[in-house]
């Protein structure tokens, strides 16, 4: 049976990550002080219209009905912040909500709220959670300096300041749902890649907008009639964009649309009772209800009345639905972009299932089976058309059930509906148990409905096929059976969703057919174990370390000690999906080795339900919302295990023809890196659209504040016939300009020097009074770090004997520092070995590391000696290990290899 949907009421208390209750206080104004005028009081608009002489209508009577909803939503928001991801971009002054899902990397800022978070706030979306579509940097604007020019086919061209717009024209205020034409695009990208990025199902938001009617402004300026050629009204923004060789963002609407009082088109200057935020077009933008967001120009500067539609690059090369056979090359070659019949203006009908949410598991027990489960979601249509019906099917469309609808808005006086509505349907849990999927479709008053199957187009726009949630029966918790729900995709570039799984299965070998059956069937195929994401997250320690790579789950616990990079290389990713990072740093051989540790597949579900329907003990109905993570203040230590931290290149110096010193500034100038002596970090960069990660040991001291130094050898192209392309990361670093941002992740490594002769190796303590240190090439950096730590502590009496091998004398890294230390400290002895010497008087060894060299320059093996080595594997095995064994070293226990 169906039950009506009510606006949910929420307290201001949310469970924090640690289980404690946190209270969020309302944030009256989250705008940056960099734009001080944002907080100025807006001049009052006239109570009666003064622009056109028309009688004011009753259309404003209900404009204050949403104040309580706005205040409630703002009261549940954490403050917006200056996100570190924006630090090196032109948007580094814009404050943003940290929970927003970024869809295009760091810049430009394109984002949507997590779907559960969006639905939690109900009808009115708080401005910081409203989806954002930016084509470039956010323009910096001041209220008092801004003006909007009206020109073209008008009798009285004018330029209106913001104060004039607000005081000389009546203002309208009403709720409008904005939708990006790319909403749900990722579903299209899973079928075939479009030219657009991965919008999820939250590219939709609703706010209360206040602004000046466009028709009033145009009438004030004396807009010409159609008979005199006024066919189109063009809008142009302020941002500088690259499209078409350089342009502003611009578009247009038909004259009839612009002048239609039923259309409620406004020049918006307030959102939810406050001035627009920078991301949403401060100080003024177009609001065109019922249209796609791409027509609502932000940072509005010009309104031009013309005969022809806008000739702007973005008007023609964006927001089009081309036939499915037309790809990007065909569209360009055959000029499809310029065919007017393919332009998008009004939104189409669409609906989405939001409850059950993605990754939800509904336990099947005596409690849940005795009461119905409520399915929920949203629906919208365009052009002011009312959504009249929403239907659910659980058997592929053979039978449909009509849902209850909740329309929180009132239509305007012309009967137009500008906002989304919410639907709900109560179903029996046993019916869900027998269903393979749940699908939804909506209808509007023009009897438009959603197609069953996805219709691909090159821009991936207006996707409105049935929204399907897959169900699987699984073992949920404590042996309990549950129903796992999976949405088609997750937004952005994150992995997850049943479409990704089915795509992987379609391209997999015949050996994976049993897995395919297990995913497509509502009952588990026990030949392949399935685990939820919440179960994987529990295995994040040395006692049990699981990782996810390409949807497969691997138990790497028994490989921790054998991993060449040390246990930390695994533990830093334990309990997570590390697909991208694994692919970035591992060879095909390593990928094959991983298969030995495969234990099952990911069903991308978590046990704790995100839905209020599954609260077993009557918890608050806010329990379906994922806990809001508190934004912690910047720590004194920069490194956060498992996280990538941004650093900025602030200095670089050539130490030789192929050696560079790079100085990277930490996120805060009062931070230390937080890297234990002997460990290293991954340096992360995107090169040719792929993640590249390389391990480096900083040469700066562990207590250096505000930055870290890396000494890097640059492997140029064609400098080594074995590696004709050179080093990918080192050449990238060498090419970077000052100010570039790189990400660092760590700590990593299995060796840690804790001071005064003490080490932890794979967590086991070791001690030595004397250290035999053997390094080759860039392998000197971790040994250099240990030397530095010992010399820095006056009470550390550990003796050090260094043998350092290189190809030539010019290749010796950090020689000046090593020689200086050796002169000043008797406990440090340094000996160099070079393959070839080009000058006379070379006082060190020539050739390779030999037994005779080691016997002369490092101590004989004994209980108080440890050997440290770092270099090429061939050097370690042939020159170090074999010769140390001849010198009475127990290489299993006394040789530490970085």
UniProtKB/Swiss-Prot annotation:
Domain FAD-binding FR-type span(s) in chain numbering: 642-754
Function: Nitrate reductase is a key enzyme involved in the first step of nitrate assimilation in plants, fungi and bacteria.
Region span, Disordered: 1-65
Subunit structure: Homodimer.
Catalytic reactions on record: nitrite + NAD(+) + H2O = nitrate + NADH + H(+); nitrite + NADP(+) + H2O = nitrate + NADPH + H(+)
Protein name: Nitrate reductase [NAD(P)H]
Alphabetized InterPro entries for the sequence: Cbr1-like_FAD-bd_dom, Cyt_B5-like_heme/steroid-bd, Cyt_B5-like_heme/steroid_sf, Cyt_B5_heme-BS, FAD-bd_FR_type, Flavoprot_Pyr_Nucl_cyt_Rdtase, FNR_nucleotide-bd, Ig_E-set
UniProt gene name: NIA1
Molecular function GO terms recorded: FAD binding; heme binding; molybdenum ion binding; molybdopterin cofactor binding; nitrate reductase (NADH) activity; nitrate reductase (NADPH) activity; sulfite oxidase activity
Pfam families documented for this protein: Cyt-b5, FAD_binding_6, Mo-co_dimer, NAD_binding_1, Oxidored_molyb
Residues that bind heme: 563, 586
Residue span, Cytochrome b5 heme-binding domain: 528-603
Induction: By nitrate.
């Amino acid at each position: 049976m169906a039950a009506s949907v009510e606006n949910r009421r929420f307290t201001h208390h949310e469970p924090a990550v640690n289980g404690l209750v946190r209270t969020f206080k309302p944030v009256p104004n989250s705008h940056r002080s960099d734009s001080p005028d944002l907080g100025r009081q807006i001049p009052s608009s006239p109570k009666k219209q003064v622009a056109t002489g028309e009688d004011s209508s009753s259309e404003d009577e209900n404009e204050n009905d949403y104040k309580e909803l706005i205040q409630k939503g703002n009261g549940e928001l954490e403050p917006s912040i200056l996100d570190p991801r924006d630090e090196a971009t032109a948007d580094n002054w814009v404050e943003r909500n940290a929970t927003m899902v970024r869809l295009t990397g760091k810049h430009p800022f394109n984002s949507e709220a997590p779907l559960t978070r969006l639905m939690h706030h109900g009808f009115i979306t708080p401005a910081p959670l409203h989806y954002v579509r930016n084509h470039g940097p956010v323009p910096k604007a001041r209220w008092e300096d801004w003006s909007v020019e009206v020109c073209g086919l008008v009798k009285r061209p004018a330029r209106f300041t913001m104060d004039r717009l607000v005081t000389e024209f009546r203002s309208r205020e009403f709720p409008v749902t904005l939708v990006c034409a790319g909403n749900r695009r990722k579903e299209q990208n899973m079928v075939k890649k479009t030219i657009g990025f991965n919008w999820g199902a939250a590219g939709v938001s609703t706010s209360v907008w206040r602004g000046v009617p466009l028709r009033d402004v145009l009438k004030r300026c004396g807009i010409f009639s159609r008979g005199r050629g006024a066919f189109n009204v063009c809008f142009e923004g302020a941002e500088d964009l690259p499209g078409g060789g350089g342009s502003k963002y611009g578009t247009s609407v038909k004259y009839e649309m612009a002048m239609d009082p039923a259309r409620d088109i406004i020049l918006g200057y307030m959102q939810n009772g406050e001035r627009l935020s920078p991301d949403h077009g401060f100080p003024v933008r177009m609001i065109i209800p019922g249209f796609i967001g791409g027509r609502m120009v932000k940072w509005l500067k010009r309104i031009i009345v013309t005969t022809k539609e806008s000739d702007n690059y973005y008007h023609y090369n964006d927001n089009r639905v081309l036939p499915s056979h037309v790809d990007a090359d065909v569209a360009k070659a055959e000029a499809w972009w310029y065919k007017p019949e393919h332009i998008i203006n009004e939104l189409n009908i669409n609906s989405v299932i939001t409850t059950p949410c993605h990754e939800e598991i509904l336990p099947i027990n005596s409690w849940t089976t005795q009461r119905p489960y409520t399915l929920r979601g949203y629906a919208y249509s365009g052009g002011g058309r009312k959504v009249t019906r929403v239907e659910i099917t659980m058997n592929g469309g053979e039978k449909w059930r009509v849902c209850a609808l909740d329309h929180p808005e009132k239509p305007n006086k012309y009967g137009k509906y500008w906002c989304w509505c919410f639907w709900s349907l109560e179903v029996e849990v046993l019916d869900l148990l027998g269903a393979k999927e749940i699908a939804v479709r909506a209808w509007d008053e023009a009897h438009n409905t959603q197609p069953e199957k996805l219709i691909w187009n090159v821009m991936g726009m207006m996707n409105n096929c049935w929204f399907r949630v897959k169900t699987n029966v699984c073992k949920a918790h404590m042996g309990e059976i549950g129903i796992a729900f999976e949405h088609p995709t997750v937004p952005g570039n994150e992995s997850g969703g049943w479409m990704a799984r089915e795509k992987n299965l379609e391209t997999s070998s015949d050996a994976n057919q049993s897995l395919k059956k297990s995913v497509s069937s509502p009952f588990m195929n026990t030949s392949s174990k399935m685990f939820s994401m919440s179960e994987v997250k529990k295995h994040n320690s040395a006692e049990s370390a699981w990782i996810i790579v390409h949807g497969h789950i691997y138990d790497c616990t028994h490989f921790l000690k054998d991993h060449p990079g040390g246990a930390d290389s695994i533990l830093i990713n334990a309990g997570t999906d590390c697909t991208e990072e694994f692919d970035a740093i591992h060879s095909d051989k390593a990928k094959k080795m991983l298969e030995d540790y495969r234990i099952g597949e990911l069903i991308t579900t978590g046990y704790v339900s995100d839905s209020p329907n599954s609260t077993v003990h009557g918890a608050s109905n806010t329990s379906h919302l994922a806990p809001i993570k508190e934004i912690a203040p910047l720590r004194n230590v920069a490194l956060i295990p498992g996280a990538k931290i941004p650093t900025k290149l602030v200095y670089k110096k050539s130490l030789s023809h192929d050696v560079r010193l790079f100085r990277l500034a930490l996120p805060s100038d009062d931070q230390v890196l937080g890297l234990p002596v002997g460990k290293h970090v991954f340096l992360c960069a995107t090169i040719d659209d792929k993640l590249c990660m390389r391990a480096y040991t900083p040469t700066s001291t562990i207590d250096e504040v505000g930055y870290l130094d890396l000494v890097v050898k640059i492997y140029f192209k064609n400098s080594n016939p074995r590696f004709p392309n050179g080093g990918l990361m080192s050449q990238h670093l060498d090419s970077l300009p000052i100010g570039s941002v790189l990400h660092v992740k760590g700590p990593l490594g299995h060796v840690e020097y804790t001071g005064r002769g003490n080490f932890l190796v794979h967590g086991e303590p070791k001690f030595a009074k004397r250290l035999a240190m053997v390094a080759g090439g860039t392998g000197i950096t971790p040994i250099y770090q240990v030397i530095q730590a010992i010399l820095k502590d006056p009470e550390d009496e550990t003796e050090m004997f260094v043998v350092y091998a290189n190809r030539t004398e010019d290749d010796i890294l950090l020689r000046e520092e090593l020689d200086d230390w050796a002169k000043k400290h008797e406990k440090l002895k340094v000996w160099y070995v070079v393959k070839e010497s080009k000058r006379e008087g070379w006082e060190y060894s020539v050739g390779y590391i030999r037994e005779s060299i080691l016997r002369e320059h490092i101590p004989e093996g004994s209980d108080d000696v440890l050997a440290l080595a770092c270099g090429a594997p061939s050097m370690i095995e042939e020159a170090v290990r074999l010769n140390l064994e001849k010198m009475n070293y127990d290489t299993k226990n006394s040789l530490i290899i970085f």
